[in-house]
Amino acid sequence: MKAAVYDVEGAPGVLKYVDVPDPVAGPDEILISVEAISIEGGDLINRRSTPPPLPSWIVGYAAAGTVVAVGSKVRNRRVGDRVTAFSMQGSHAERWAVPEERNWLIPDGVDMAEAAAVPISFATAHHCLFTRGMLRNGETVLIQAAAGGVGLAAVQLASQAGATVIAVASGTERISSLHELGADYVVDRAKNNVVGSVRQYTHGTGIDFVIDPVGTMLPASLSALASEGRLVFVGNAGGGNLTVDLWPPMQSNQTLMGVFMGPLFERPGVRTSVDNMLQAVAPGRIRVVIDRIFPLANAAAAHEYAETAKPLGRIVMKP
């Protein structure tokens, strides 16, 4: 099969499109013929900064496709099922073997590109907002990097839950789209100071709850937070030092929580949230925003675009 692999970490150009042996499904796994691959922030970070443990390492967390083989212990999937999946590596390929517990059936009316982008973006946003953040109707929520996959999901879910949503992004098209998806107020970070804008919008009180997938924005996120507010930081898309002074948040009785979704996808609550999000796509209750689709053969260009073009939503590749 063909796959996008790398032998040394670095810029997008380290990715090579080559022939590699087909994977074989283990007893507890299914084998997917991949039809759509969602490029996730973790894929970019791993390729950029994580030495591959083996030669011709296949990066990639998320993809959707059709089941072509099942392991001897698999009971809930059969050949021909349309599924979307999450695993810690291997999605940037024509075929992908994943555990039975880390894939979900795709409902009718949901295409493969949409399905590939749902689990990480929407399960992460849902977990941050409601499981960890305990977001309540009427609260104000600040969403950093709101034009990314997790950010766009969080804007929609928070708005539907009755929160006042303040989104941070840049660019006219992105700002317009965020308003359409439910943001009450959008701070253009290229033109305005985020903390000052938030303080002005909230009449000086600050935000009840912040989702920060950037990492390097943590000082600003904390400064925008109200007394006794909550902040969830999920990842480090900014790639910088996450050191922050914890004395001011302690004095303000604020709560900081970290979320790393990798080990959580087999939990029943997270699995159910992914199923619910997938069911919400076809009726239009949620919108999966895809900026651009590349062929897998152009994986290096797709990664370059994801890192530098300031896309709105996810970048998808197709084998």
PLM feature spans:
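NAD(P)H dinucleotide-binding glycine-rich loop of Rossmann-like/cofactor-binding domains
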Residues: 45, 82-145
